């Protein structure tokens, strides 16, 4: 079984003035830490919402020129027996490269053969 695992990372960024700047720097910083070993990990802005009213908020919180940015890192883990196994592998692989950055598994989805072929651009038709 193959699984797509999405992990949330809380990336600290220093000397920033705006949330947009913080997000750009956090994505760049995370990409540098993951590459070239884990260039197959997709990096996206995290989605945050207010715990009280549920409204969407910025993925970065800026105070005193420092920021904490929520990023979502996703990767496909191949040949696992259970979802928990896929989550552990993803946390270990990503966590080794992102030292001192908190990680939390957001979701684990089973990947079907159709999903794999669509994401890799495979063609199922035969001539």
Swiss-Prot record:
A Pfam family assignment? DUF555
Note the superkingdom of the native organism: Archaea
Family, according to the entry, reads as follows: Belongs to the UPF0212 family.
**Protein name in the entry:** UPF0212 protein VNG_1264C
Give the source species: Halobacterium salinarum (strain ATCC 700922 / JCM 11081 / NRC-1)
